[in-house]
Amino acid sequence: MMNMQNMMKQAQKLQKQMEQKQADLAAMQFTGKSAQELVTATFTGDKQLVSIDFKEAVVDPEDIETLQDMTAQAINAALAQIDEATKKTLGAFAGKLPF
């Protein structure tokens, strides 16, 4: 019975640590950039959009498609950074689970 209690205590401790890491990650900001950094997108670690910024050179009413493509590049780059940080931050817990 003692072994089960120790496992539960360890699991609760790991859960608190993981929740703190998730909160830390959510408080961070990640910025993705398009080619030539003409579009930047900034997200929080919990994938909430903070801002999208456009350089004047990319705003051309005759070429909306380029603006759309660069916006998608910037957003995807930021989201990839978040995914990588999440793997690094929370992936460490996978090997520590007591069961």
Swiss-Prot record:
It is found in: Cytoplasm, Nucleoid. It comes from the Bacteria. GO terms for molecular function: DNA binding. Keywords: Cytoplasm, DNA-binding. Binds to DNA and alters its conformation. May be involved in regulation of gene expression, nucleoid organization and DNA protection. Belongs to the YbaB/EbfC family. This is Nucleoid-associated protein Sez_0297. It comes from Streptococcus equi subsp. zooepidemicus (strain MGCS10565).
